Amino acid sequence: CIRDRLNSAREGHSLACVMVDIDHFKQYNDHYGHPEGDACLASVAKALRDSVRRPGDLVARYGGEEFIVVLYRATEAQVQQAAERIRATVEALAIPHAGSPLYGRVTVSIGQACARPQDRHASVHRLIQQADEALYQAKNRGRNRVWPLTVECMA
C-alpha cells in the first residue's frame, strides 16, 4: 500500500510517485469508441507493469486515463530512467491515435516527485500532488515527455 511505502520513506528510504496520463485520451474515445478506449487502457496498463518490475514497486490505475507508479528505494536517476522507460514503452506500442493533434499514436505524459528520507513531513497527499503538478508541466511543455518536480531522491 502507498501509505506503507511512505512510512518507509520516514524510516530512511526514498519513495517516488510517478503520475502517468494518456495524452488526448478523450479524443481517442471520441474517435474510436469506448470499447477501443478500454483496450487502449489495458495495453497501457500492461506496458506500465512490464516497465516497472522491481520488488516493492507498485502500478495502479489512479482514475480515468491516469495511472500512478510508486517506486520504492529508488535514486533520482532510477526514477528518471523508469519514467522514460514507461514513456518509450507506451510510444513503442504504436497504437494508432487519429485524434492526437501531435503524434498520430498513443503517447503519455509523466510527472514525478520524490519523498526524501529526511522529509519528516511527507504525506501521501503531498507526494501525489507534487507528481500531479509535474504531470501538468509535462503536458504544458508539449506532452509525450517526462517532467521531474524534484531531483532529491536518494536511496
What does each model-identified segment do?
Residues I2-A16, D23-D50, A60-G64, I68-Y72, ...:
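Conserved long alpha-helical elements within nucleotide-processing catalytic cores of c-di-GMP signaling
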Residues Y72, E76-E84, P101, A115-A155:
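Catalytic-core segments of nucleotide cyclases and related cyclic-nucleotide turnover enzymes
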